[in-house]
């Protein structure tokens, strides 16, 4: 994380900073707080079922990871990608952030996505708008390889889909 921090500082790009490391107890407390805060904001996340010092239990999340769904490189994959855009926008409009908005940290369930993995705290290194910008960079970067595999006719629809979500 030190190398990424240094590169981000030299380039003046705070959203590229990694969250500084913390103790296991602080990491767990942060993840529980994020799960509860996001759920209260109406964002699909696993429910926290039980908390003890040193561990917590959350509801099992059935489904397939978004990065795996995107690997199909077809129209259905594009629909999943667009759902990810829509979810990220909903998170940000609710005044929230994810912290690790990588495609691997979303689970497709039925026709919705569930977000996972909240132990990082980017607000320890940047402002909320910067953390939200970091979410967009993580999501778009982590889905880029799968999107490159799309047939050209589908790939050409990407800018319009992104504009439609952000409009």
Predicted regions and their residues:
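ATP-binding glycine-rich loop module of kinase domains
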Residues: 1-26
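Conserved hydrophobic "DFG−1" position in protein kinase catalytic cores
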Residues: 50, 60, 107-108
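C-lobe/activation-segment region of protein kinase-like
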Residues: 114, 118-167
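Short, charged/polar, Gly/Pro-enriched secondary-structure boundary elements
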Residues: 64-67, 123
